[in-house]
Amino acid sequence: SGALYTIDQHASSGGHASTLAKEAFVYVPENCASGEPCRAHISFHGCNQYADAVGNAYVTQTGINTWADDNNIVVLYPQTKKSLFMPLNPQGCWDWWGYTSSDYANRDGEQIKAVTQMLKSLNHEGGSARHFEAEGAKMKETPNE
């Protein structure tokens, strides 16, 4: 089994995190932390499943981490936040209806840009697998040896 970490979404999202919670979760399988090449996967929670509403239940109880252990996959769990003001998001949903902008469903959408930047900060460049190493509450990329 691996380890669960938090990362600062605002710091790693390239300024596109206004509708996101401060922290995201990252699950790192033991094999990935010990140097085996690993891939990355993004798991988006549903409405009312953001961390402020359910703690880490979505992250720890869906079975995704067991699948990640078996397949050498680092899992990024980005987190939204509830908002009762504009942009209105009272159930902490990902933007699937346009509450952030009309670009919500394409790569120019703010949430897509934020998650893409987070993944780049953890993951790889050019599609090549890398090793992942956890260092405190930050994720540090270490190159293949």
Located regions from the model:
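Cap/lid segment of the alpha/beta-hydrolase catalytic domain
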Residues: Q49-A57, D69, L76-E125
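Surface-exposed acidic, glycine-flexible loop patches that form ligand/cofactor-binding
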Residues: Y27-E36, I64-A68, H124-H131
